[in-house]
Amino acid sequence: MSAVRAVWNVLVPPLIVGVLFVGTWEIIVRVFDIKPFLLPAPSSIWTTLGDNWSKVWDAMLITGANALVGLLFGVVCGVALSFVLMRFNVVNELVTPLAVALNAIPIIVLVPVFNNMFASTTEVPRRLMVTLIVSFIVLLNVAKGLRQVSATHMELLHSYAASPSEILRKARIPNAMSYLFTALKIAAPVAVITAFVSEYFGGSQNGLGYGITSNAAISRTAASWGYVVGACLLGLAFYLAAVLLERLASPSQRSTHHQPTNQQSTNQQARGLDPGGATA
């Protein structure tokens, strides 16, 4: 019963807000007689989306593939670089400011550059753009998780003469996991946004970005909004996948009644490092 109530509390409030927003939008368009090419009514968008759903779905698959490939490569690159930054302070001091500065550059500035570097008709520039954005998000978060380990845990492990690799395995990596999943939940929808915005500037002519711009250019605003809805659904799917992955990888978060405290857990881990400790 509590699980049903929890789901109810999570899903119902956003649904109510969404229904109120769409209803208000519909009323405003009809009352003020706003022209469809300026702002179509949600009912018009829904009808057009139904008529063109096969095209929108195909566009979602293309943009989703670019976002997924870039997301996977970005996570791998970000995690790998975070270990390098954790290990070498000099590299951390050099790379972190550069990563922050590059992350502040708008997507619309870098995509044309990548299109010139690679063939604009391929998906490489868009996937590379997603990889770059995602890797920065993952890098900054995971590097922070690897470094900001509890001082108590570190002192306890040092008291057991733990080696750097043992500290990494028993303290730093477990601490960084929550940072990784936080970064993943941020990066997943950002990957979709980056993928379809990158399509504004070339590449495949059947992705979500091209569908938005091409329909807007000929004043088919309702059709353009249909592709926007497709982008929203795709971003939501990526986010929910990240949340599900976190739940599957961290089952202890669902039930903590019989879990030891952080201090007890560290003590148990550290005993395995002490030759004279308990082995039971």
Regions of interest found by a model, annotated:
Residues 116-117, 146, 193-231, 254-258:
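Glycine-rich helix-loop "coupling/hinge" segments at transmembrane-helix boundaries
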Residues 100-137, 144-145:
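Generic hydrophobic transmembrane alpha-helix motif, especially the helices
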Residues 89, 178, 225-280:
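C-terminal transmembrane helix and the adjacent membrane-cytosol boundary/short C-terminal tail
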Residues 69-99:
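Transmembrane-helix boundary motif in ABC transporter permease subunits
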Residues 3, 31-75:
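Periplasmic/extracellular loop-to-transmembrane helix junction in inner-membrane transport proteins
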Residues 8-31:
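N-terminal signal-anchor transmembrane alpha helix
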Residues 128-132, 165-198:
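Transmembrane alpha-helices
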Residues 141-180, 209-212:
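Short cytoplasmic-facing helical segments at TM-TM junctions of multi-pass membrane proteins
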